[in-house]
Amino acid sequence: MGGGGHGGGITYKGVTVHTPKTWHTVTGKGLCAVMWFWILYRAKQDGPVVMGWRHPWDGHGDHGHGDHH
């Protein structure tokens, strides 16, 4: 199924898992970090709305339509 026997790897129950190249590891960790930063950023922005703590239209601060309180 796979390629030749080049490079190191770990064999378990007849299946050889080859070690990833360094750039694969670094790229994967970088993309993982970007993903978690994005998830946490969106959770900060949308969390109260998703949890039902406030409505999406509350607190936008735009009272320029003649609303005087």
UniProtKB/Swiss-Prot annotation:
It is a peripheral membrane protein. InterPro entries: NDUFB2_plant/fungi. It is found in: Mitochondrion inner membrane. This is NADH dehydrogenase [ubiquinone] 1 beta subcomplex subunit 2. The keyword Ion transport does not apply. Accessory subunit of the mitochondrial membrane respiratory chain NADH dehydrogenase (Complex I), that is believed not to be involved in catalysis. Complex I functions in the transfer of electrons from NADH to the respiratory chain. The immediate electron acceptor for the enzyme is believed to be ubiquinone. It comes from Arabidopsis thaliana (Mouse-ear cress). It comes from the Eukaryota. Belongs to the complex I NDUFB2 subunit family. The keyword Mitochondrion applies. Keywords: Electron transport, Membrane, Mitochondrion, Mitochondrion inner membrane, Respiratory chain, Transport. Complex I is composed of at least 49 different subunits. GO terms for cellular component: mitochondrial inner membrane; respiratory chain complex I.
